[in-house]
């Protein structure tokens, strides 16, 4: 099959190649420790674009393994394509590993309790506290511009990002939630697998929205096995109805599970347009 240079597939492939090239041999990587609540020290990866001077900050926040035994075995998060996309646009990218995960270790701060009565609201705020600690620490670095930070999160990290929006941290003009939520892929008391208590997610989203004033972009794929489109719509409707300002982009299916879109290079053509448009809209 011959592909025209005007083909959308070829154009998307060209973009992917340029993002990969931008990341190779030019970005600088450093592992740092960031003070967090309770005396914890979070391990974080810092990726810097070439050149000197102060750059805007992008914080990318990871998800959580379904199997609790895997939390402390987690490798440091990478999100290479997502990171490269922001680095190519001049951002310093930071990927913190929150309390209770991987090399950071310690007690799991985001424990939401039992599946029958989950505290998704409190769990999200614990994750938000770690993101806020990352913002505060990184803004003190000589190479970071303290007046512009974009917060991005996927799955549990997306949920923590939604929670952070309720705190309205200064100089954060926008936040991006990829497939955010908690309690997915759990064994249900009535049998089968699913979300522990979807109504609790919707209620917590509304509570966050009641104080949130920072613009948000929510991205969910059609075949997300953790948080299906109807649930995503219910959450964003509750968030906005309570006073929040979120735009939901319901994207098409991605691979075998749309929940993995943010972590795959193949997902870039799906989300890059909405993300670029969102960033352009911010003051």
Language-model region placement:
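Short glycine-enriched nucleophile-adjacent loop
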Residues: 158-169
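Alpha/beta-hydrolase fold nucleophile elbow
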Residues: 143-154
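The conserved beta1-alpha1 loop
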Residues: 61-63, 220
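C-terminal catalytic histidine-bearing segment of alpha/beta-hydrolase fold enzymes
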Residues: 233, 242-283
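Short substrate-entry loop that stabilizes the transition state in hydrolases
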Residues: 53-55, 64-105, 228
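Alpha/beta-hydrolase active-site loop
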Residues: 113-142
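The feature captures the conserved acid-bearing segment of alpha/beta-hydrolase catalytic domains
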Residues: 174, 180-242
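N-terminal cap/lid segment of alpha/beta-hydrolase-fold proteins
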Residues: 24-53
């Amino acid at each position: 099959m011959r592909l025209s240079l005007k083909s959308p597939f070829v154009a998307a492939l060209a973009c992917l190649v340029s993002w990969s090239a931008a990341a190779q041999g030019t970005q600088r990587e450093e592992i740092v420790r960031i003070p967090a609540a309770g005396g914890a020290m979070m391990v974080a990866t810092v990726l810097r674009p070439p050149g000197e001077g102060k750059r805007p900050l992008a914080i990318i926040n990871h998800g959580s393994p379904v199997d609790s035994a895997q939390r402390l075995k987690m490798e440091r998060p990478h999100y290479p394509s997502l990171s490269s996309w922001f680095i190519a646009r001049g951002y310093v990218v930071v990927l913190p590993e929150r309390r209770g995960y991987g090399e950071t270790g310690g007690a799991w701060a985001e424990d939401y309790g039992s599946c029958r009565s989950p505290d998704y609201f409190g769990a999200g705020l614990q994750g938000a506290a770690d993101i806020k600690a990352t913002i505060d620490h990184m803004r003190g670095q000589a190479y970071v511009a303290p007046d512009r930070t974009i917060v991005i999160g996927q799955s549990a990290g997306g949920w923590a990002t939604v929670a952070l929006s309720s705190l309205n941290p200064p100089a954060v003009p926008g936040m991006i939630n990829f497939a955010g939520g908690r309690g997915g892929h759990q064994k249900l008391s009535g049998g089968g697998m699913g979300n522990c208590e979807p109504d609790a997610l919707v209620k917590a989203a509304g509570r966050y929205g009641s104080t949130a004033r920072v613009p948000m972009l929510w991205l969910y794929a059609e075949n997300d096995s953790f948080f299906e489109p109807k649930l995503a719509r219910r959450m964003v409707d509750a968030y906005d109805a309570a006073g929040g300002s979120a735009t939901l982009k319901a994207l098409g299916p991605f691979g075998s599970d749309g929940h993995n879109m943010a972590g795959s290079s193949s997902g870039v053509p799906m989300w890059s347009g909405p993300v670029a448009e969102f960033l352009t809209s911010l003051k």
